């Protein structure tokens, strides 16, 4: 049973896409899995090179920009968001609304959205080993995984209202710019 890990971003340094690839590389050694990378941006070619370097090219799919994110998220088992800066984490919220648990960094609004040990796991940004460990732990425990799926969906429902999301984004941008 192959696991699908996913990351969605603009491939800018702040999103730490190389960390996503390194996390996946560790997970892949333990669990049969694939990585889907959605989006495009300045670090894409570096990320493609890293996949070649790690010998995982055949397991990583670069999808470019996509319009139908829910369709892609519906096949995912885990959403990886190791950003070093994030105001809110809308793509993580979208994943959670599709019952996809999240492994994220602890920056910006992510800890408010992704509840550690309930909807996914949180680690310090840059801690590739810990994020990989959490991913393996969650994907290896079906009972816990199903609970996290339900929790992620329920948590996303709280934030679903467009107005709330807009308010949170403004709030976090204000806080982060101070």
PLM-predicted stretches and their roles:
Residues 65, 84:
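Aromatic "clamp/platform" in nucleotide-sugar-dependent glycosyltransferases that forms part
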Residues 89-92, 110:
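Short glycine/serine-rich donor-binding loops of glycosyltransferases
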Residues 130, 137, 144-158, 170:
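A short, well-ordered alpha-helix in the C-terminal region of glycosyltransferases
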Residues 2-6, 17-62, 144:
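A conserved nucleotide-sugar
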Residues 70, 77, 99:
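A short alpha->beta transition loop at the rim of the catalytic pocket in nucleotide-sugar-dependent
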Residues 161-178:
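C-terminal alpha-helical cap of glycosyltransferases
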Residues 116-117, 121-128, 137-142:
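Conserved acidic donor-binding segment of nucleotide-sugar-dependent glycosyltransferases
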Residues 101-104, 114:
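Short hydrophobic beta-strand element within catalytic cores of glycosyltransferases
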């Amino acid at each position: 049973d192959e696991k699908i890990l996913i990351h969605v971003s603009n491939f800018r340094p702040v999103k730490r896409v190389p960390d996503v690839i390194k996390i996946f590389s560790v997970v892949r050694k333990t669990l049969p899995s694939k990585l889907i990378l959605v989006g495009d941006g300045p670090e894409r070619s570096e990320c493609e090179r890293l996949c070649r370097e790690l010998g995982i090219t055949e397991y990583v799919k670069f999808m470019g920009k996509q319009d139908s994110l829910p369709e892609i998220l519906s096949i995912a088992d885990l959403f990886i968001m190791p950003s070093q800066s994030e105001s809110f984490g809308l793509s993580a919220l979208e994943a959670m609304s599709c019952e996809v648990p999240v492994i994220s960094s602890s920056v910006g609004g992510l800890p408010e959205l992704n509840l550690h040990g309930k909807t996914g796991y949180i680690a310090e940004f840059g801690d590739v080993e810990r994020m990989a460990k959490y991913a393996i732990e969650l994907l290896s425990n079906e009972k816990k995984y199903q609970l996290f799926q339900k929790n992620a969906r329920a948590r996303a429902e709280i934030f679903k209202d467009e107005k709330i999301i807009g308010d949170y984004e403004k709030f976090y941008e204000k806080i982060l710019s101070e």
